[in-house]
Amino acid sequence: MIPLSHGLILAFFLFSLGFVSLVMHKNILFMLISLEIMINSAALALVVVGNYWNQVDGQIMYILILTLGASESSIGLALLIQCYRHFKTLNIDKLSEMNG
């Protein structure tokens, strides 16, 4: 069994990695991937804490978060495809400059 502190440190590291990647990248696709990393790291923290307390609530919440992440990524990818077809770019700075 993985100790609680190791699991939470890993979840914090993954969340921090996703946040830094979200802030640094200008491409919408990479930003979407960074959001998925952050969501999955929060789910990992719930599973680790649930396992520590011998409760299945963390795993149930993981299934809920996994469903939420799948719907978020499918909607995000659909919007990303439409954005690329319309503006021919995925750079967030260039998209914010285009008005109209």
From Swiss-Prot:
It comes from Buchnera aphidicola subsp. Baizongia pistaciae (strain Bp). It holds the Pfam family Oxidored_q2. PANTHER family: NADH-UBIQUINONE OXIDOREDUCTASE CHAIN 4L, NADH-UBIQUINONE OXIDOREDUCTASE SUBUNIT ND4L. This is NADH-quinone oxidoreductase subunit K. Signal peptide: none annotated. One of its GO terms (molecular function) is NADH:ubiquinone reductase (non-electrogenic) activity. Belongs to the complex I subunit 4L family. The keyword Translocase applies. It is an enzyme of class 7 (translocase). NDH-1 shuttles electrons from NADH, via FMN and iron-sulfur (Fe-S) centers, to quinones in the respiratory chain. The immediate electron acceptor for the enzyme in this species is believed to be ubiquinone. Couples the redox reaction to proton translocation (for every two electrons transferred, four hydrogen ions are translocated across the cytoplasmic membrane), and thus conserves the redox energy in a proton gradient. It is a multi-pass membrane protein.
